[in-house]
Each structure stands twice: as structure tokens, then as C-alpha cells.
Amino acid sequence: QATEHNYTGCNCGIMDQFASVFGKAGCLMRLDCRSMEFEYFPFEPKGYRLVLVNTNVKHKLGDEYNQRRRSCEHVVEVLKPNYPGIETLRDVTWEMLEEAKALVPEVDYRRAKYVLGEKDRVLAVCDALEKGDYETVGAKMYETHWGMSKDYEVSCVELDFLAELAKECGVTGCRVMGGGFGGCTINLVKDELYDNFVETAKTKFTAEFGHAPLVYDVVIGDGSRKLD
């Protein structure tokens, strides 16, 4: 995190780095970025595959990420005089956000709205994982993708094309993976739909954009560790 802050100019969070070290095979992790406490939730979607689709569109994240962070911080600054106990958007309620709506630029409101919605979605997905409810997990993935596209504005036409295509193919869940502005979608695909989805994604994406996406079957593995 310090390297990204000090050398690339991207004021990123800690989530990616933390997951890369503390990841656990067959589990998703819920991380509290304030206390650094974390909890594992079993991810065992029998009858499904995790499929990564790479748009091969490169993204430059630095200032775009910083702009969104400033938007979120601005909402907190506006609310602090009336709510001195809040520190970050995690402390802001939906009612508080509606109070701020008339006091901040519309783009700041939308970006903060995405963050509050994502907080709710994380909790809903953790609950669904404990119940083995992968239909709900998938639905929340789509909600996240379109929130990132329409409210947070970190998607791109190629990623949105893949998300729409996934829905048409009956894919259970799809969302942008990573920082956005290109890169990949992660897809939760039923086994019986896998072949059709992969073939359709390759064919239609190539026809639309003139180059083929790369498709990978992926599994959740352990974090980085010393190899003997």
C-alpha cells in the first residue's frame, strides 16, 4: 500500500494486498479495513465454475481512483459539522447521505451512494454464503457491476458488454474484477452453461471489438507463502 501511495500516486486501500497475503483456499474473506480484522466464509459452489474473462483493455488507475476517493471524502466533510462522530463513509447512513445530496455535486453523491450500497451488498453476500445461496451471491455481483458502472463510473464499454452478455447467457453472477477501466469480469457460471457462455463471449466480443478476450477457469487459492 505504501508503495502505491508513494511511488505510483494511487491512494489505494489495503484490500488487494491483504487478500494476496491472507487469502485461504476455498474461502472468501470479509475484511474490516479500519480494524484489520477479517473473517473467512466458505465458497463451495457445487455445480458452478468461476470464470475470469479478460477484455485485454489496459487501465491507468492513479488519478481516476484518487478523484473517487476525494468525492467520498467530500461527502464526509460536508456531514461532519452535524455528525462529528463520523470518520469515513462507513459511518454514514442512508439518511445522512440524503441530507448531503443537496450540498454536494451530483457526482459525489452517486459515488458515495455506490459505497454505501456496496457495504450492504458485502453483508448480504456473507449471509448468503453461510446459507449456500449462490443465486443471491450472483444477483449481488450484477448489482455491484452496474453500481460500479453507473454510479462509481469505473467500468468501460467492454466490461459492460461482457456483463450484459453474461446475463443473456444465463450466467448467475458477473462483475468487474479489480480497479476497473478495463481488465476483467469474474463470472459465476453453472456447469451446464459453461461451454455456451465461453463460446458466445469469445465470438460476440471479437465481433464487437476486433480482438478476442482471454478466458480462464479460476479457483480461490491460498495467499502468498514461502515455497519449499
Region locations from a protein language model:
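Glycine-rich, mobile lid/loop segments that gate access to catalytic sites or pores
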Residues: 1-17
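C-terminal nucleotide
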Residues: 22-173, 188-228
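Short, small-residue alpha-helix embedded
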Residues: 182-188
